[in-house]
């Protein structure tokens, strides 16, 4: 009688605490081919980017270290750009090859600055953050273009704000306006009108229009007539006022040859031709005549 064979051991199921295997290191050479890591090349750990649209918190300075020298960097893209210099030196790219060719994908960039920005495409990092809204960018140039829409002077970190008596930007106003802009963005502000009045939150397409509007609240009249000294909030209004002194009437109606010294009265007059007096659109002929006489005298 044959002896019964013992039951095979039942393999134990892995527990949740068992560590997952570490991802392998990837060695990249100038033509982009992964190879077996020799001792004299750079080992770059694979970085998985799951969401390039999110804006993660920036890592601490010196989080990513170079394998060939003591240098440390805050961003993986900065480390890649630095290690590109080592690879270029070892492969002789600085003499016979292309020193601005990405050693990850082989893409040739116009120059070192473009190459530095190009490496962020591989890592998904967006290190250039807007201080006025949650958006972040991969390069400095698009950040500057974006901040200009907020009213930030190019090349500075200061917004175009009313100043104090010493000529310095008013930090309190900056804080108030920043809060208004953020609140408008959170509430779904009007598309195409990113600039909000800091007094009433009225949106505008251009920062210059917003500043002109804010003078209604502050009472500021920086444009003064050189003849009578009257002040105005906008230069265009001052130009129209100056025509009262010069007698210039450049706006002519093509239907009745009447002339006007400002475009506002000219547009009101034109509506009377197309809609007629008393139609509810614009002013009646009598109202227009009295308005024109009072402003053109």
Curated annotation (Swiss-Prot):
Keywords: DNA-binding, Metal-binding, Nucleus, Phosphoprotein, Repeat, Transcription, Transcription regulation, Zinc, Zinc-finger. Residues 1-12 have a biased composition (Pro residues). The keyword Cytoplasm does not apply. Pfam families: zf-C2H2 (PF00096). It is found in: Nucleus. GO terms for molecular function: sequence-specific double-stranded DNA binding; zinc ion binding. Residues 162-173, 287-297 have a biased composition (Polar residues). Residues 1-39, 149-175, 268-297 are annotated as: Disordered. A zinc finger (C2H2-type) spans 64-86, 100-122, 128-150, 195-217, 223-245, 251-273. One of its GO terms (biological process) is hematopoietic progenitor cell differentiation. The keyword Nucleus applies. The modification Phosphoserine is found at residue 13. One of its GO terms (cellular component) is nucleus. Belongs to the krueppel C2H2-type zinc-finger protein family. May be involved in transcriptional regulation. This is Zinc finger protein 784. It comes from Mus musculus. The gene is Znf784.
